[in-house]
Amino acid sequence: RPAGGRAINRRSMLKGVGGIAALTAVGAGGSLTASAPAQAAGLSVVEHQDGGRMQYYRFSTPSIGWNPAVNVLLPDGYNASRRYPVLYLLHGGGLNADFRAFDYEGIRDLTVGRELIVVMPDGGKAGWYSNPVSSNVGPRNWETFHMSELIPWIDATFSTIAEFSGRAVSGFSMGGFGALKYTAKYYGHFASVSSHSGPADLRGPDGGM
């Protein structure tokens, strides 16, 4: 599902995608597999579009006040009898930046021949990959959606290496912050992290945003 968005630096994207290349060797033997059904992750699929390599899903979840979505890019010749490493690719913020921008900027071509699954989740326009203390637009707990619901759902739905050695996370701008935050806070979830133009600290001089 392509959509307009801010231009993405292709060199940075290649580096981000390349960050998981080593995992294909590390996790090739594969291993921890998810045995729970997909719905146990707390997500209900309300829409699915099969685009060949690109699979689009939209969910109902109590964590978000609307139906968030995700693009899942499968490798060429995806085979459910094999196990694949997964790259979680997090988008930046702003009105014209969302998870679909990666497809618009050519992520399919950039990953040709790479034996990995790329997961590009919705993160909101200014969600900062966090659970806000309060919200006047209903729940928007992006951190819970990504870390407690989406990752287990991905592992239950696709043939992944469902352990530390089989996951990497990369992001751009706001997504770069999210990649750093998730890796630091959820130790043992990701074997590789890369942040491109992502702030490491959101606090201003007075300790606020």
Regions found by a protein language model. Name each.
Residues 1-8, 19-26, 34-36:
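N-terminal secretory signal peptides
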Residues 12-23, 38-209:
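Non-catalytic cap/lid and distal C-terminal segments of serine-dependent acyl enzymes
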